[in-house]
From Swiss-Prot:
Known partners and oligomeric status: Homodimer. Heterotetramer of two MnmE and two MnmG subunits.
Source organism per UniProt: Lactobacillus acidophilus (strain ATCC 700396 / NCK56 / N2 / NCFM)
HAMAP family (UniProt xref): GTPase_MnmE
Cofactor binding summary note: Binds 1 potassium ion per subunit.
SUPFAM superfamilies per record: P-loop containing nucleoside triphosphate hydrolases
UniProt keyword Magnesium present: yes
Gene Ontology CC terms: cytosol
Record-given protein name: tRNA modification GTPase MnmE
Cofactors required: K(+)
One matching Pfam family: MnmE_helical
Amino acid sequence: MAQVLTEFDTIAAISTPIGEGGISIVRMSGEDAIKIANEVFKGADLAQVPTHTIHYGHIIDPDTGKTIDESMVTVLRAPKTFTCEDIVEINCHGGIVVTNHILQLLLKHGARMADPGEFTKRAFVNGRIDLTQAESVMDIVRAKTDKARQVAVSQLEGGLLHKIRTMRQEILDTLANVEVNIDYPEYDADTVTANQMADTAKSVIEKIDRLLKTAQEGKILRNGLATAIVGQPNVGKSSLLNYLTQSDKAIVTDVAGTTRDTLEEYVSVKGVPLELIDTAGIHHTDDKVEKIGVERSKKALERADLVLLLIDASKELTAEDKSLINETDSKKRIIILNKSDLGQKITVEQMKKLTGSEVISTSILKEDNMDELEELINKLFFAGIENSNDQVMVTNQRQTSLLHKAKSELEDVIQAVDDGIPVDIAQIDFTGAWDTLGEITGESAPDELITQLFSQFCLGK
């Protein structure tokens, strides 16, 4: 881990969402955090209070002597804080004006506006957390289901860090033997160390493969399963969206073409996070505005992981229905025969025989058979996923790409040993894999990558 750094200036930011609310929090971190807070706080002498204590008082503008707000101020002294620096958190009444006024007061008295993710970056640089734990901070904030939260918490507690470090140590132990052989060639242990490298490479590859098997589930838990609701106009798409979200996000009428754009919403169905996309009806139209909606719907369909295709069961299949069936044939999909209460011209058995897909019959407005739909969504989500109930998962593309790179480097080591290439040459890829795994945790990550990663965080984190 990195050594604790003390040359940072003092930063400040609003840590709660901007807007009206009961409480807002303005956070400072740095060597002068307590001193600056003391200059604007009327109550206890913050310079003298014990660490990890909270104090009632008022925020005062020293220039005017006027009270800005009453507040509760928390004092946390280094090094036992999130950033390993002195931290002060000012709890004030929620609202844009009062919160921003307090922030500006802190900036005026010597703090600097924090960059996005800078609090978490300081925690990383000061050795409090590694990169996987830093990423988990935002995963907890953005978690869409309880399962996603559990995985993020496990990562914050060092679950993935432990697995990566175990693999790196395995490589390092073998590298030590290789270095001895290179430095003392008279012992003629070249074959032994080459075989050790190959065996270690195989062992680490097995561990990498186990992590990579979690990548698909981890990605979906983090980002949601992009789910397009498609069908002809007035087939019940908006009714389905409203049912799944338990709200009236979409307008439901008997007028075709009511939805002229894509509507998006995140929901949890049986623990599966869905990014629902209610599309405009995909059909031929001469209406210019409706055409735009249809084009956006087609793009939404292209990126969808799952398609919920609605067909009016009370009517014979139309040419447009058949076209949609063909267009979605390559996707994971569930075909929903809606309006079954109006009489069925198409049966579940007929549709299954025609498409080979999962099919249910329902009346969405009457909520008939909707439990079966939710079960099917869960079933399709886990199809092809090795679900071990392990809380340690690979949750983003950065981690996945680096694991693939490390695996490739280790495969090159095995090939080099098989080809009889000298140990000191094969060692290059072996060391490369050790470095690549270190990029996942940040122990060997370039500064540019670290800066780019933390820039994706929001202010105050």
